[in-house]
Amino acid sequence: MIVLYIILAVLVLLLAVVLLRTAAFHPKAEAFRTYAPVEFDREAAVTNLQRLIRCRTVSYTDASKEDPAEFEKLIALLPELYPHVYEKCTLTRLPDRGLLFYWAGKAHDEASVMMAHFDVVPVEEENWKKPPFEGIIEDGVLWGRGTLDTKVTFNGVLTAADHLIAQGFQPEQDIYFAFSGQEEINGPGAVNIVHWFQEHNINIQLVVDEGGAVVEDVFPGVKQPCALIGIAEKGMMNLEYSVSSAGGHASAPKPHTPVGALADACCKVENHPFTMHITAPAAKMFDTLGRHSTFLYRMIFANLWLFGGILDNLCKKQGGELNALMRTTVAFTQMQGSKASNVIPPSASMVSNMRLNPADTMESAMEYIRGVIGNDAVTLRCVEGMNPSPISETDCPAWDKVASAVAGTWQGSLVSPYLMVQCSDSRHYGPVSNHVYRFSAMDLTAEERSTIHGNNERIRTEVIGRAVEFYIRLMSQC
C-alpha cells in the first residue's frame, strides 16, 4: 500500500510540474510599439519587377543551354529602373555573374549586405496557365518565373534604395547589395563576392538573404501569421550507394542481385531515421511560437523533457517540415540498374539527397548510414555536399534590425527564428559574419509557396510593395 501511495504522490507531483510549466509557458510581454507608415511609389515597384520578369535569365548546369544575352539585358535595364542607385552607388562586376553595389554610409566601421539572385530555374511552358516570361498582370497577380524566387527581393532591395536615395537618405554605415546570377546551379558567383569582402577586409555585421517568409498554418496550434527568419540552414549531401556483381542472365539469379541489395539498403535507411536533435534554431522557434499555441501543444513544447519522445514519433510518422527541423533527412531520388529486363546488372546504384541537421556533419551522416545498412557490399560515395551553416545570434542589434523591419511591415505577425531546410547563397557568408539571416520578404499562402520551382509561379501585387517596404525599414536602420 505504501508503494501505491508513493507512486500516486510521484504522479501528482509530475502532473503539478507539467501544469505549472505549461501555465508559465505563455507569450512573453512585449513593449507596445507603433510603426510609422512608409510612403513610396508602389505601382513603380510592380512595373519594375514586371520588366525584370521579361528577362529570361534561366541558369543551367550545362552552360551551352544558357542565353548570356538575357542576363546582359537584365543588367542593362537596371540604370533605367533604378537611376538614383546608379547615381550614388558604385557597381563592381565580379566573375560568374556577380554584381556588387556599394552604398557609402556616413561611417565605414561596419557594413550590411542585402542579397538576392537574379537567375531562375527552367520552365515547362506548356504546363503554365500564363506565359512565364511576359510579365502578365491579371486580377492583381503578376505571373512569371522569378516572381517569388528571387527577383521580387532583387527588385525590393534596389527599389528601396532608389527611393531612399531620392529622399536624400544616407545610411549610418556602409551597405552592399550582393547579387548572384548562378544561385540556382550552385555556381561560384556568391563565393566570388565573399572572397572580395575578405580581400578588402570588410567588417560585415548583417547579412540578409532569401529564406523564411510570413506564412500561416505552419506551426501546430498557432493561427496567427508567422514571420520565420532563418538563423541557420541545414547542410546538404548527395550520397551515392553502389553494389557490384558478376552480372549474368536473369534466369539463374543468386539470392541477392545488386538491385535487391540496394532495395534492402533503401528500406533500412527509411525505416531507421536519424536521431532527433533539437538544435538552437528549432529550440528558439518552439520557445517563440509554442507559447502562442493551444493548451495541448503548449503543454508538449513546455515539457519536451517529458513529451519529447511523443513529438519525435509523431514527426517520424508524418514527415514534413516539422520533422525536417529536428533531424537529418534522407530522400531517395535516383536508382539505376540494368538496361535490359532479363540481365542482372554488373553494377547498380542509387542516390539519396540528404539535408543535414546542425548536429550532424557529412562524415557523421555517412557513418550512420553505413551502420544502418550493415552490408559491406554497399559502397557509399559523397557525390557533392556541404556541412550545415553556422548558427547566427538572435540577441544582438543585427537581429533586432531585421525583426523590427519585419514586425513593422507585417504588423500582428509572430516573428520567430527557425532553421532553413533549403540551401541558399548565404551559406557562403559564415566565414565573414556571425549575423546571417534568411528571410524572403513576402507573405505567402501554401499554394503560392508550391509554385516556387514549379508551374505557374506568381505573386500578388500588394506583396511586391510589402517587400520594398521591408527593405526601406531595414535600410533606414543601417
Give the positions of each predicted feature.
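Acidic/His- and Gly-rich active-site-bordering loop/insert found
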Residues: 5-145, 167-171
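Short glycine/serine- and small hydrophobic-enriched flexible loop segments
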Residues: 18-21, 159-166, 264-268, 473-476
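An extended, acidic, His-containing surface patch that forms the Zn2+-binding/catalytic region
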Residues: 92, 107-109, 215-216, 278-339, ...
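A common structural junction motif
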Residues: 118-119, 269-273, 370-378
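Acidic/histidine-rich catalytic neighborhood of metal-dependent amide-processing enzymes
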Residues: 142-144, 148-228
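Midchain, well-structured core segments that form catalytic/ion-binding scaffolds
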Residues: 191, 199-363
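Short amphipathic alpha-helices in soluble, non-transmembrane regions
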Residues: 256, 365-373
